[in-house]
Amino acid sequence: MKLIVFFCLVSLGLLSCNKSGGSTPALLTPTNLMVNVTVMPDNSGNVSFVATATNASTFEFDYGNGIFESVPSGAVQYKYTSSGNYSVKVTAKNGLGASISKTVVVPVIVSLGLVWSDEFDVAGAPNTNNWGYDIGGSGWGNNESQYYTNRSENVYVSGGTLKIVAKKEAYQGSAYTSARLLSKGKYSFKYGKVEVRAKLPAGVGTWPAIWMMGDNISTVNWPACGEIDIMEHRGSELNKITSAFHYPGFYGGNAKVNTTTISNATTEFHVYKLEWNANVMNVSVDDKLFHTLPNNATIPYNQQFFFLLNIAMGGNFGGSIDPSFSTATFEIDYVRVYQ
């Protein structure tokens, strides 16, 4: 009997003893893992997974986007929020932790729906339900030379586009005027696709921007709130487009920046796009990707953000202003958000 007991102890992972001195199989390592995947054909992002295995009591799904889920039955439906080829790892486990895994690549196409837009199709002042204004001429932390107003001389809608006009004129102690619109307190969102169709102003010293700031800027300040520069442009670099991400540790001159070159930036309309989710942020012009930032929970890009549209003059980015500059117009055809 002592020999039998000793055998049972050293063989615990393989056999168990019964009263008659025989043995019965213990929980065995899972085998025969099969994963059936059904991608819904409506481009909704919904995917059905059915996993089966011998000797498995639970199934863990790594959806390939940083999301994990444990499912006892092995059957689960998951909704992806953006298109991509996702490497999904399925692990079948038994009660003792023994496991077997399989990885399948799941191609997903997600058709996003338009959830908010301003088409700028009503002439006059911009829609006050969508836009407010920053007013003043304090340099705005960048040694800028303009005074921002909400006057019709500096901002108006006509012919189906928003016009932001920078002018050389003495006003409130500044040598230039312009406008800066923002959707703060009126519209903000987290994740999705942004498209802005715009024609940039011409003139050395102009600094137009399409950008976003975190809703919590009033409580945590910049750069803790995060900043997304979808498009910035120096008038001295006619067709060079800049995108930047500012956040703690990487801001100002140390921001995450990239550039691209396009044709006719100031004479033709181009579509500036941000694709933003919990895993990545992609910026493109006319569907040409040129700037990417991996997203994660340690940086401030998992909260509500609002829009800003403006022309600055000079400053740390815009540089020296051409003495012959008189006026320049930033035209925006639409701002659209898809989710």
Regions found by a protein language model. Give the residues of each.
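GH16 jelly-roll
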Residues: 17-50, 58-63, 70-79, 83-96, ...
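Sequence context surrounding c-type heme c attachment/ligation sites in exported
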Residues: 55
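Sec-dependent bacterial lipoprotein signal peptides
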Residues: 1-16
